[in-house]
Amino acid sequence: KLPKELPETGGIIGGTNGNIITYWIDEVQKTKQSMCSYVPDTDKMNSIIEKWFNEGIEFLGIFHTHYYGVKTLSDADKDYMRRIMNSMPESIKILYFPVFVFPNNEMVLYAIKYQTMEIMLCNYYII
């Protein structure tokens, strides 16, 4: 299900066996965002991630929305991805960072690998 929020809002995705099964939208932050950047409520996100962990759900990454037609990552997006991956335990080998692009709610899936910090564009399919 694609978010219907304004550009530069976001949240987190969780799942099992590499499949996304749940998500959380950062409701508090959407009222505080500029139209050019997304700043997540990390305290709330971390509490959701901890809750998911206790339920057997893995943290798989963070999504956010972009302005009309912008499918590429900004330098700030890439820096944020690297900082998040650097804070993960070594058991986390990859994190996903979907970007939902308005106006067609197109999803562009990016990921980052732990060992190399390589950011890549990924193929995906919806079940």
Regions found by a protein language model. Give the residues of each.
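Conserved beta-strand-loop surface patch within small alpha/beta domains used
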Residues: 1-60, 67-127
